[in-house]
């Protein structure tokens, strides 16, 4: 992976293991720094990608009605604690002028934005803004539901608690009926 200093991550993980009183040379931990470095390269791969790249290919289709891809699974890492949060994203847009993108591109944009140290609010807004800026639709609505391990494993310790964030752009900002339609389809 570009921009990833594996040796530096491995060194830092060894220091953490030592700082908590573990022996990084014991059998179960000897390869842990290497594994963690490799994992970080994978789970943070979106850091050096632009989600807008996924919307470069568009199709002309006589369709100016709602498009919704729901229940897109994702995982990310909380930038405050570097522990996972995971859930589903629902991405809706109304094409303008018949300009549509491949459905998988919506899921790829979610994945790109999620694969970095992140906040759920930022994932939601960045996906919406990327679609709005590249496809110029009538509107975009993104709803993200996630469970945060920083609330499950530590602190308040509330397993199962879900956080829901929304980002509305264009027509969805003012058209309550359109917004309600998306929410109804997500729930249905």
From Swiss-Prot:
Residues noted as binding Zn(2+) in the record, renumbered to the chain: 78, 81, 150
PANTHER family membership: GTP CYCLOHYDROLASE 1, GTP CYCLOHYDROLASE I
Name of the protein: GTP cyclohydrolase 1
E.C. number: 3.5.4.16
Any one of the GO BP annotations: tetrahydrofolate biosynthetic process
Functional pathway: Cofactor biosynthesis; 7,8-dihydroneopterin triphosphate biosynthesis; 7,8-dihydroneopterin triphosphate from GTP: step 1/1
Superkingdom, natural source: Bacteria
Species: Geobacillus sp. (strain WCH70)
């Amino acid at each position: 992976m570009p921009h990833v200093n594996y040796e530096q991550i491995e060194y830092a993980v060894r220091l953490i293991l030592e700082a908590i009183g573990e022996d990084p040379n014991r059998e179960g931990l000897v390869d842990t720094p290497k594994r963690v470095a490799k994992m970080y390269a994978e789970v943070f791969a979106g850091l050096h990608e632009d989600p807008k790249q996924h919307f470069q290919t568009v199709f002309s289709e006589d369709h100016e009605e709602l498009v919704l891809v729901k229940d897109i699974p994702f995982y990310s890492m909380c930038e405050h604690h570097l522990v996972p949060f995971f859930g589903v994203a629902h991405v809706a847009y109304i094409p303008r002028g018949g300009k549509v993108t491949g459905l998988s591109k919506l899921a790829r944009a979610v994945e790109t934005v999620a694969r970095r140290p992140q906040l759920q609010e930022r994932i939601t807004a960045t996906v919406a803004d990327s679609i709005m800026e590249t496809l110029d639709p009538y509107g975009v609505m993104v709803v993200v539901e996630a469970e945060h391990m920083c609330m499950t494993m530590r602190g308040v310790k509330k397993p199962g608690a879900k956080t829901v964030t929304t980002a509305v752009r264009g027509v969805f900002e003012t058209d309550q009926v359109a917004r309600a339609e998306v929410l109804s389809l997500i729930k249905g």
